[in-house]
Amino acid sequence: MSTKDLEASMRKSLEATQRNFNTIRTGRANSSLLDRISVEYYGADTPLKSLATLSTPDSQTIQIQPFDISGLAAIEKAIAMSELGFTPNNDGKVIRINVPPLTEERRKEFCKMASKYAEEGKVALRNLRRDAIDKVKKQEKDGDFSEDQSRDEQDSVQKVLDKFIVELEKQLADKEAAILKV
């Protein structure tokens, strides 16, 4: 595995962690908060995004405009049952969610959730490093690399990992700052 391939894999892992971060509330309304919500629609779990248009008319409101009005009740139920703690307001045509300001306790909970996502991201990055180092060791064993070349490759793999860990830590710090900002 070349370092470019490794970097591409690690970049994808980092992007997945960033998507997880985007599902955590900050003080502002953001339609990506609803990305993980699935709605039981005609007997199948369907992502909310494929059933409705999501918008944020102001910093404290998320508006959901279903493509099919008959799905309004199912969407409302899915949002109410989610762990986000939102109370949807259904006016018969659209659903509005007022995003209340976060309490200090909720902010701390969300910081813990962000830390958990960051740790999962680090584990994924370390697994990619392990796989890359295993391939290098196999190449050394097969005679494709000398011991010195193998060590150099392993060092370069570690440097790539270190770079991505620093980037992930920065993303975590940014997310925690956004969560704690009042």
UniProtKB/Swiss-Prot annotation:
One of its GO terms (molecular function) is ribosomal large subunit binding. It comes from the Bacteria. GO terms for biological process: translational termination. The keyword Membrane does not apply. Its main location: cytoplasm. InterPro entries: Ribosome_recyc_fac (IPR002661), Ribosome_recyc_fac_dom (IPR023584), RRF_sf (IPR036191). PANTHER family: MITOCHONDRIAL RIBOSOME RECYCLING FACTOR PSEUDO 1, RIBOSOME RECYCLING FACTOR. Responsible for the release of ribosomes from messenger RNA at the termination of protein biosynthesis. May increase the efficiency of translation by recycling ribosomes from one round of translation to another. NCBIfam families: frr. This is Ribosome-recycling factor. It comes from Synechococcus sp. (strain CC9902). The gene is frr.
